Amino acid sequence: MRKRISAIIMTLFMVLASCSNQLEAEKLAAESKNTFFDSLVKIGQGFQDIFGIFGNAIGDALGFNAVKSDDKRSKVGEHFEGVGEGLKDTKIKLDELLKEVTAAPHADTTEVKSVINNAGAVLTKLIDSVAKLAGATKSEAPIGDAGTAQAAAATPADIADVNTVIEGVKKIIEVAEKSGVKIEKGTAGAQVANANGPKVLTNNAQADANSGPALAAEVDKADPWAMIDKIKMLKLLLHLLHLRLMMTPGQLATGSANAANNGTAATNADLAAAVALKAITKGGKFTQPAANEDGAVKVAAASAVNKVLGILDAIIRKAVNLELGKIKEAVKGIKYSEITGEATESGIDQPITNKSSN
């Protein structure tokens, strides 16, 4: 009888112990899930902060209205600096998000960290390119600087600065294309005769009447995507030899007045891109305008510059948004795992919303 009672007591003890262990395990599991969800909330908030900072930064530096006709070229440098600061702030927030993801318990964050690191590398390359562009566009000369002396000839833009701009544009496009951005070629337009605009960039004497308004009209109808494509396709300018009658943007911007006199632009986009290159780098001056046409030349210069800046901003915005979109999808795939630390991406999907757009 005593043995039976002892057995019953032992059985009850084991049952109670088992129940206690099960309750403790369930409690720990619940706490683990709560910790996991808390971490996801922090990650989601950090992700939203990134979108907010980036959107505000690029929105404040919208390139299509960056400069006015009476601005100095340093205004372009300030624009690039503003874009660069926005990218840097975004990179800082991205690094903070990486720390949150790394610290998240009960989740495998390997894929997410890889995507964040890739996005960080893209931002770093864009920051570097924008910084170089800012350094090459710091001249205190006016955007539409032109000769004022009697029959003043055009003067060439600084080759080193033009090369820096070419390299910067090429690098931004290269990075963006790797991120998945489609770079449009645009419509380049027809060849432009010397009297319809190129004379203002290259002539060795005062420009003829109506050449200033003609240049402004050509720039106004230029396709900004085609302008960027023309700059992208330029080779670095090592010298000024072998100038052709139908000139590229680089030749129109950096050619001497004597060598480039009477030259024509290969296309409308070549002409407009040349105006932008000459208007943002140091050294370059437009030909002395005809009487009362200096305003038209300044308008042409500002319009060309804004078109280039606007498309570059659009490309940068698309590249970063695509990278952030990749992070969003990776974060959505983080799922709960019973294993502490980095485990598997299986269990509970966590949706994250944002207001991004390409």
Curated annotation (Swiss-Prot):
It is found in: Cell outer membrane. A lipid is attached at C19 (N-palmitoyl cysteine). The keyword Lipoprotein applies. SUPFAM superfamilies: Variable surface antigen VlsE. A lipid is attached at C19 (S-diacylglycerol cysteine). Belongs to the variable large protein (Vlp) family. Beta subfamily. This is Variable large protein 9. The lineage of its organism: Bacteria, Pseudomonadati, Spirochaetota, Spirochaetia, Spirochaetales.
